[in-house]
């Protein structure tokens, strides 16, 4: 079971990429994602909290995957992704699971989810690049709300959240260390629930 940390960068994407390149990181992947969030249609918005929303939800994903040879040509992928997260009361993600199913197109995927009893809530778009230094993959996400997020997943050597936190601190890059579990959908959910004061 994999886990991850996601932190907010406190600099521009270009500055962040330059810092990583200077530290020996190289671009290994590039893709854009348009995620549409679905939850069980029987869930009432007034009964949802931020943490229990993330316990179980489904994404309808349109991925623009760039060819690794040049990162210019691309092809489209479509997926339904089922996600579960075990979240502590303070918002830390204890563990999580993800199950992907490739589909042929978004229209039919939406029809299937609605037929299975899900309702559509909102869509979030992001541009993502992954950099690798021979040891770790660092994913940089440029989210439509302006956030620049960095994601680091557990692997054989970095197999705990504490090790991930230490690794990203050791890189000495400009990040907000007040939250290691930033959720890109959090602002949208708070808007839905009427909790956003930003």
Segment roles from a protein language model:
Residues 110, 149-150, 161, 165:
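Hydrophobic, well-ordered secondary-structure segments
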Residues 137-143, 147-149:
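Strongly charged, low-complexity linkers/loops
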Residues 158-176:
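Long, well-ordered alpha-helical scaffolding segments within enzyme catalytic domains
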């Amino acid at each position: 079971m994999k886990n991850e940390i996601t932190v907010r960068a406190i600099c521009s994407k270009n500055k962040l990429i330059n810092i990583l390149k200077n530290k020996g990181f190289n671009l290994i992947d590039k893709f854009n994602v348009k995620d549409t969030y679905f939850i069980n249609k029987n869930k009432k918005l007034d009964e949802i909290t931020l943490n229990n929303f993330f316990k179980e939800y489904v994404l309808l994903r349109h991925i623009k995957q760039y060819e690794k040879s040049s990162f210019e040509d691309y092809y489209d992928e479509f997926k339904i992704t089922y996600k579960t997260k075990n979240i502590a009361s303070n918002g830390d993600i204890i563990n999580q699971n993800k199950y992907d199913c490739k589909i042929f197109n978004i229209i039919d995927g939406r029809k299937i989810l609605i037929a299975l009893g899900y309702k559509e809530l909102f869509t979030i778009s992001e541009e993502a690049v992954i950099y690798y230094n021979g040891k770790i993959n660092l994913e940089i996400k440029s989210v439509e709300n302006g956030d620049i997020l960095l994601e680091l997943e557990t692997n054989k050597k970095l197999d705990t959240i504490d090790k991930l936190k230490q690794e990203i601190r050791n890189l000495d890059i400009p990040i907000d260390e007040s939250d290691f579990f930033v959720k890109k959908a959090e602002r949208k959910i708070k808007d839905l629930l009427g909790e956003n004061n930003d």
